[in-house]
């Protein structure tokens, strides 16, 4: 999938709007942050990473390193911290607890293109990556996002 910075920011804003009734969230200003939204729910600091997908699947795949990076943040603080992954498909947002993904997901090592197939359709550069494969029914909450 080709990275479109404007579309990504629009998706983050849509998620921010949909989550406003659950807490006070802001968009991360750091482009390289491991999370996209941060704020508080019931006075507990909350971080949310957003991933957009083009289709709905029974099982989702995410790089294990992304989940590990989010979990490290939780272990670095003594304060309570909630960390979620939100997968967006069209106008639906699915919220998952990162700890649930780690505990209930299946870790696999797969070979994948180093670059996206859209940007480099003939790429034969393959690397091995660890991914976590988890069921969509692990989601805690399904949100409707506005256009």
What are these regions (language model features)?
Residues 1-29:
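Acidic-basic catalytic patches of nuclease active cores, encompassing PD-(D/E)XK
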Residues 2, 89, 144-147:
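Ribonuclease/tRNase effector modules and their secretory precursors
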